Design a protein with these regions (language model features):
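Aromatic (Trp/Tyr) and acidic
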Residues: 13-43, 50-86, 95-220
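Flexible helix-coil transition and linker loops at the boundaries of alpha-helical arrays
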Residues: 1-7
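Short hydrophobic beta-strand that contains or immediately precedes a catalytic carboxylate
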Residues: 89
């Protein structure tokens, strides 16, 4: 039985939806993919936090009913999202497990940008800007940017392939602050070997690049 984890990709229904959207866009509204996305709409609505930002890219090729269904789901999703984000003063999804949460913060910043583009009357630009502010220094413990070489002060000792040199890779983004339960935020500035705080991960960096470009577009 297929199980999604780490390098295996996401849930099969998620991957099917992503592929359908990409093929719809690539074929400029190909009928098989429009039909499939209509069939997948219940999946998109159920897993909106993962799929909503992807599904809105299909709107130009779908009927008005598809867009209105996404809008209704987005309104419900936003109520729960705002409730969750209000639990900390930064207004972002801070991780409370054993891994720093910079990736999920950058991902939310990027995802909400796409939702803002499609539904500016429902989603504002503040989610994207708050997310970028967080990874660049507005976070617990310090004001050090999680992105090496980006920001006035940035993480210059990290878990990359040169970690034994206590060095860094420009542009790499670390996971960041870990909340040691119940309430102690930790980020070691000078010890690179705690990978759950300091490891560079490729998809995290690409997510930051997407979020940074989104914030730049909003600021123009």
């Amino acid at each position: 039985m297929f199980k999604s984890f780490n390098t295996t990709g996401g849930e099969l229904s998620d991957e099917e939806t992503k592929a359908a959207v990409e093929l719809l866009v690539a074929t400029h509204g190909g009928d098989p993919y429009r039909k499939l996305l209509k069939e997948l709409l219940p999946v998109i609505q159920e897993r909106f936090s993962n799929l909503g930002w992807i599904a809105v890219r299909a709107i130009p090729f779908m009927d008005p009913e598809f867009k209105s269904s996404l809008a209704a789901t987005l309104r419900s999703y936003k109520v729960k999202l705002d409730e969750d984000l209000s639990k900390n003063p930064y207004g972002v999804p801070i991780a409370t497990g054993a891994w720093g949460g910079s990736h999920q913060v950058a991902a939310l910043a990027a995802h909400l940008y796409f939702l803002h583009q499609s539904f500016p009357d429902i989603v504002g630009s503040e989610y994207t800007l708050r997310g970028l502010d967080y990874v660049l220094g507005t976070h617990p413990v310090s004001n050090v940017s999680y992105v090496s070489s980006v920001g006035a002060q940035s993480k210059l000792v990290a878990y990359g392939n040169n970690r034994a040199d206590y060095s860094f890779i420009p542009g790499g983004m670390i996971p960041g602050v870990v909340i040691v339960q119940p309430d102690y935020p930790e980020l070691n500035d000078d010890w690179p070997f705690l990978w759950f705080e300091n490891e560079y991960v490729i998809d995290t960096v690409t997510t930051f690049i997407l979020a940074a470009n989104a914030a730049n577009a909003l600021a123009r």
